[in-house]
Every structure is written in C-alpha cells, then in structure tokens.
C-alpha cells in the first residue's frame, strides 16, 4: 500500500483541472489575439485617426467577445452556501463544505469544496458539469454520476434538475436557455453585419445594426428572466442550510453590453442627422466619398459624379465631353457617327 501512496488501487487519484471553462478560454484567446494583432499595426496609422481607430477596435471586439462568452457561460444564475452535510451514501459522517451552483444556458455546474479541503482522509474538491444542450442528455450524465459515486451534495443538486424531478427546474431552465441562446446568436450576426457596414460608406445602417445587436441581447435577458420566473419555489436544502440562487455575472454583463450597443446606435443615428461630417471623420471616411443613391424621377441609380454636381450649391463647369455625351444620349438620331467625339 505504501507503493500506492496510501491510496486504494480501485480509487483514481485527483485529476488536474483547468482553472476555467475551456470554451471560454478559447473565445478569450481568439479575441485577445485579434486585439494584439490590431495593436501591432497601430503605429502605421497617423494623426488622431489612430486614437479613433483603436477605440473602435476595442469596443467592437469587446462586444463580440461578450456575446460569445456569455452564450457558453454557466453563470447566468448562481448560488453559494456553506453547509454541514453528509458526504457519502450509507455513511453517518458529516463534513463542512462550500457548495456552489452555477446555471447556464446549456446546463448546470456544481462545485463542492471542503473547509478544510482535507477531510475524512480525502480531498474534497469537486467541479461537476451536467449539460442539456442539443445533442446532450442530462439524464444520461446524471446516471453516470450515480455510477461514479459522487458525493451526496452534488447528487442531490443534480437530481433537482433531472427531467423527472417534481421541481420542474429542468424544463424551465432548458427552455429559457434555448430561447436566450438563439437570441444571442442573432445578436452576434447583427454584430458582424454592423462591423461590415461601419467599414463602408453606410454608417447609419451600421448604427441600426448596433441597435439590433443591443435589442436582441435584451430579448435574451427577457426570455431567460420570464421563463425562470415561472418556476415555483423549490427549496435546495443541504443539511441545515438552504441554497438560494440569483442572477449571475453573465446576466449583468449581457445587460450592460446590450445597453451599450443601444446607446452607441442612438448616438450614431443622432450624429448622422446633426453632424454627419464629424461622424465620417471618426470612422476615417471622407465626406466626398461617392455614394450611389436612387434617382427620384426615373427610379434609377444616380452616378456619384452627377449626384455631387446636383447637390453642390455652386455652379460647376461641365466638361465638353460629358455635355456632348449627354446631348447625344437625349437626341434620337439614326446615325451613331454624329455623336462620336
């Protein structure tokens, strides 16, 4: 037994765990890499445009990273309690533990940490996830947890979210997660369209897409709050303590980001009405950039050249070649050679 480190051969040792969710780590790494890349090329931009460009990049990457991160986060609804409870089935021994419950859009995460960690000759430090996303079966994962022999507090909380539990937590949170996740994916697509439009001379439509991005984020919060509010109170008792849940960091970050998107969209809409030249200067676009518009008389696209001439308050000289070509276009002459220059 000494060769095994005082550990029974049929018990596996403590596995090393990554300090955070791997999906969130990948998302954060991707956006940080993009930010570092943009910062590297920042010295190549001259003047005040450098500061405006950096502000746009940081804000845009922050919004996109938040939308993706909260979609995979397990901290939409959280709870934490310190309790004295039983540790294993068919054992009268009690332990002092910190129990954490994190509910996300795709499942629940349960943490169990002993205070102190070493109790009953064991290391009490568990972090178990149970998912209900598409393609995952919560009931199967709960059955595997029973076979694995997880501690009683973990199994007790996991059992409350099973489909057959009388609490009804599974159906409500699963439905809320599906609707909220769908709204966040639409918000992410609106964010992509906003970035495309803000790089083109259609800034006002980019502002509209920012408004849509914020509205869909708020819709995700609305669906999550409305669906979870329909749940009847189901006490989560651990020994003599009761675990209560409340909105977590992911919920409040989504709310703040959604309000930020709406504010930016409104500012762009007002700036487009009041100060269009300053708005174009902020996005490093010249006020003289040609923009195709629909003609009011014939319903066709106006050429940028003629649109600038028509909108100019000063009289402008039209080149002879342009004037003669217009005359030839209007006259119905059977011979093409008379209109050649």
From Swiss-Prot:
Transmembrane regions listed in the UniProt entry: 25-45, 52-72, 184-204, 206-226, 250-270
PANTHER family assigned to the protein according to its UniProt record, in alphabetical order: DUAL OXIDASE 2 (PTHR31158), DUAL OXIDASE MATURATION FACTOR 1 (PTHR31158:SF3)
Keywords from the UniProt entry: Glycoprotein, Membrane, Protein transport, Transmembrane, Transmembrane helix, Transport
Cytoplasmic side: 46-51, 205, 271-341
Major localization listed first in the record, in broad terms: membrane
Stretches of the chain forming a coiled coil according to its record: none
SS bond partners: none
Gene Ontology cellular-component terms listed: endoplasmic reticulum membrane; plasma membrane
Origin species: Mus musculus (Mouse)
Subunit architecture: May interact with NUMB.
Keyword Transport: yes
Superkingdom as given in the UniProt entry: Eukaryota
Gene: Duoxa1
Protein name: Dual oxidase maturation factor 1
Subcellular location: Membrane
